Amino acid sequence: MDPQCTMGLSNILFVMAFLLSGAAPLKIQAYFNETADLPCQFANSQNQSLSELVVFWQDQENLVLNEVYLGKEKFDSVHSKYMGRTSFDSDSWTLRLHNLQIKDKGLYQCIIHHKKPTGMIRIHQMNSELSVLANFSQPEIVPISNITENVYINLTCSSIHGYPEPKKMSVLLRTKNSTIEYDGVMQKSQDNVTELYDVSISLSVSFPDVTSNMTIFCILETDKTRLLSSPFSIELEDPQPPPDHIPWITAVLPTVIICVMVFCLILWKWKKKKRPRNSYKCGTNTMEREESEQTKKREKIHIPERSDEAQRVFKSSKTSSCDKSDTCF
């Protein structure tokens, strides 16, 4: 018979056994890379010893996780994927499965047989359903472009290494007056080995109010949790108003007026100091001209007088000489 058909038939029989047992499986949750407790919940009302019992756990594919045969662990029947990953607590009748992987999720059975000389008798069965979770990292916002004209910004929000697949990823924009949620198309990728998810969204977020500062959050929603990113703050630059010349004129005009007044004052003082000197010089020149004219007049008047006197002297000297010599012309 085809091995795949055989495995499929085994799984069907195992599920049917769960259904026919009449007991709902105990739901267990554990986290990736941690430890899950698979209880057997055996009351042992007859106080039977482990040396009389055969206890083992198997998964939904009938692969044996652990077997305690008459009080001793038996590894011959343990599947390789569980080898070295289990430990049995005889006090609580619990099997611990370590280093959990996503693929460990599913149905498990704890089965106990009582070994008698006549054969094995099943005395207990416990069904468990294991869910394996992995917490996503805190969402992170990364801008992929600068703010464009205070109108919008392109950004990416991402979260990694989580399981199961999240329900929703969005961006929340808060301003002073409003709160807006932007939904994006979630991009998913799953690791082939760990089966963990990485998710992200890329959005162009427009600003509803360009006059106020804003805060952006990234939100990741799973079945159990709601993760919030650290706040991403945006401080918009205030639009520059047109240049106002009135304050400039108001500041400069008094200075100009003061400078003009000082200049006029200096000029007035300079003229005031210069004016007496000019009048003095003018008076001096006038006096000098008058004295010169008077001198000239005097010279005109005085020169003939001196000529008459000279003529008289000359005549007198001539007469006297004529008298002495008695010869005159």
Swiss-Prot record:
Membrane topology (Extracellular): 24-247
Return one GO MF term. virus receptor activity
Please give the residues the UniProt entry marks as glycosylated: 33, 47, 135, 146, 154, 177, 192, 213
The record's disulfide annotation reads: 40-110, 157-218
Q: Which GO terms describe its cellular component?
A: cell surface; centriolar satellite; external side of plasma membrane; extracellular exosome; plasma membrane
Q: Where are the transmembrane segments?
A: 248-268
Q: State the source organism's domain of life.
A: Eukaryota
Q: Where is the composition biased (Basic and acidic residues)?
A: 287-312
Q: Mind telling me how this protein is modified after translation?
A: Polyubiquitinated; which is promoted by MARCH8 and results in endocytosis and lysosomal degradation.
Which tissues is this protein detected in according to the database?
Expressed by activated B-lymphocytes and monocytes.
UniProt entry tagged with the keyword Nucleotidyltransferase:
no
Cytoplasmic topological domain ranges are: 269-329
Q: Where in the cell is it found?
A: Cell membrane
Q: Which part of the chain is the Ig-like C2-type domain?
A: 150-225
**Any keyword Cell membrane?**
yes
Annotated GO biological process: adaptive immune response; B cell activation; cell surface receptor signaling pathway; cellular response to lipopolysaccharide; immune response; negative regulation of T cell proliferation; positive regulation of cell population proliferation; positive regulation of DNA-templated transcription
What does the UniProt keyword field contain? Adaptive immunity, Cell membrane, Disulfide bond, Glycoprotein, Host cell receptor for virus entry, Host-virus interaction, Immunity, Immunoglobulin domain, Membrane, Receptor, Signal, Transmembrane, Transmembrane helix, Ubl conjugation
Q: Which Gene3D superfamilies match?
A: Immunoglobulins (2.60.40.10)
Please state every residue range assigned to the domain named Ig-like V-type. 33-131
How does this protein lie in the membrane? Single-pass type I membrane protein
Protein purpose: Receptor involved in the costimulatory signal essential for T-lymphocyte proliferation and interleukin-2 production, by binding CD28 or CTLA-4. May play a critical role in the early events of T-cell activation and costimulation of naive T-cells, such as deciding between immunity and anergy that is made by T-cells within 24 hours after activation. Also involved in the regulation of B cells function, plays a role in regulating the level of IgG(1) produced. Upon CD40 engagement, activates NF-kappa-B signaling pathway via phospholipase C and protein kinase C activation.
Question: Record's PANTHER family?
Answer: T-LYMPHOCYTE ACTIVATION ANTIGEN, T-LYMPHOCYTE ACTIVATION ANTIGEN CD86
State the name under which the record lists this protein.
T-lymphocyte activation antigen CD86
Q: Native species of this protein?
A: Homo sapiens
Chain's gene name: CD86
